[in-house]
Amino acid sequence: MKAKLLLILPIALLGLAGATFMATGQDAAKPATVKPLRALLVIGGCCHDYAAQKDILKAGLEERANLTVDICYSPDKSTKATFTCYEKENWAEGYDVIIHNECSADITDPTVIKRILDPHLSGTPGVNLHGAMHSYRSGNYGKPVTAGAGNAHWFEYIGLQSTSHGKQLPISITYSAHAATAGLENWTTINEELYNNIQIFPGTETLAKGKQGDSETVVAWAHEYGDKKTKVWSTTIGHNNETTADAKYLDLVIRGILWSTGKLGADGKPAPGYAPTAAVK
């Protein structure tokens, strides 16, 4: 009887160890919960329907990735719109990416501009949409600025200097080969504004060009900013609500967010855990 017990005990222990190993292995195989990316959308100012676009962008972008978008909105429709979120010393703390969609062309205070840019210089990625390219301008911004000059800082962050646009007409968009555009189909917008580009800074990579009549220029691009090589992605497309709500536009912008945060594969697909949890409508 003792011999049988001695034989059964090791077998039972072996079975228990196997069960423990299997349970541990199964637990290890379960994917860890991935926290959503946190984005801050700064939006408001002159010349656009930002009251509607803030909600269009939040809904459309959150639908396309494991992403939470907080909104810092100013109802001020002037070119001197200011934003309460910028009043905090560490205003970007806790966010993985800042989406700039403000149109504050006549905010020229260098202290304010420095506070806005400091998080990006420290490594917080940036995504810039349409009117952001025409914000924080001073001096003779109609001419190419000099690198390092007081009126160059915002343009250096953007990676490109734009000063104006023509009348609204459809823009034919053609993509370049890049992870942020992989798999995206060329398309034509409704009536939109084609921004001019009077200076493209070294290191800026063209992602898309837009053609409107006989004029063709860069409409989406990316670069690395400052000593930290912060990833910054931008597009000048996005004036009208219909364009902002267009699936092709939202697909482009979400690529910029994922690329800038390092959550985009070379095939243009989100990194594991950052794909949308439900099918895009």
Describe every region a protein language model picked out.
Residues 1-5:
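Positively charged n-region of N-terminal signal peptides that target proteins for export
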Residues 20-28:
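Signal peptide processing junction and immediate N-terminal pro/mature segment
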Residues 44-47, 103, 165-169, 238-247:
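Active-site rim elements
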Residues 62, 68-70, 160-229:
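Catalytic beta-strand/loop cores that center a nucleophilic Ser/Cys/Thr
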